[in-house]
Amino acid sequence: MTKYTNADELKSLTLGQKTEYKHTYEPELLQAVPRSLNRDDLALGDELPFVGCDVWTLYELSWLNQNGLPQVAVGEVALPATSPNLVESKSFKLYLNSFNQTKFTSWDEVKETLVKDLSACAGETVKVDVFPVQRYSQQPIVDMQGECIDDQDIIIDDYEFNAAYLESSTSDAEIEETLHSHLLKSNCLITNQPDWGSVEIQYKGKKIDREKLLRYLISFRQHNEFHEQCVERIYTDIMKYCAPESLTVFARYTRRGGLDINPFRSSHLLAPKDNLRLARQ
């Protein structure tokens, strides 16, 4: 349980509550969560130790054209890590559902509406793309880059979050490598529902012990935080205990409510090169 679970800013969220689905456009459905809740807990100041974004894929995006003919699309959203707020995912789903019976004059109007509303919620300009479904018909399913660290012959008997697994986890050998794990699992901060993800860690610096890194990632298994907060915690813990020269942490979470969230945090990169889904997405 995190220190801010009972924060006042979380009490008004529709997440975890029975809600009515709206079918006509209602931007007020979007709800913001201050990023400061998690960042204060991590003792991060105004100068963030990372850049990056939250990449969302919108698989259930539909509206009516001026003739009343339904349109369907896949949307991609990039929410800057520097924005004061993240967008709460259930409210995002409810907001997108409000497009379903709403007429828009063009696809451009849909995109402009998404940019306007999401930017207002996040507190910073959000990048949005709206694509025809056909664009995704040939999109490959990919694996994460680098070596997978999951197939280790180790015994795990503790599933409580513990950043100390990363203590004394580096050797003197200097290396630049990319590792990934599909064993990332945490729980929703509000509902306790499981969140399933894969995480890619690219770093340059002293070599990180793979067993200790895997034990650390598995320790999120009973941990309650939003996707974005977990990734920022992973980034700051690796920086604290391993002190790499450069670091990028990219997690891709499985889809829920027609949305997947893919937080990306880096010492030097603003966004991932591609938004390509994994097998579980």
UniProtKB/Swiss-Prot annotation:
Catalytic activity line of the entry: 7-aminomethyl-7-carbaguanine + 2 NADP(+) = 7-cyano-7-deazaguanine + 2 NADPH + 3 H(+)
GO terms assigned for molecular function: preQ1 synthase activity
Active site: 188 (thioimide intermediate), 195 (proton donor)
Record SUPFAM superfamilies: Tetrahydrobiopterin biosynthesis enzymes-like (SSF55620)
Keywords: Cytoplasm, NADP, Oxidoreductase, Queuosine biosynthesis
Pathway(s) the chain acts in: tRNA modification; tRNA-queuosine biosynthesis
Residues reported to bind substrate: 87-89, 227-228
Subunit composition and interactions: Homodimer.
UniProt similarity note: Belongs to the GTP cyclohydrolase I family. QueF type 2 subfamily.
Name of the featured protein: NADPH-dependent 7-cyano-7-deazaguanine reductase
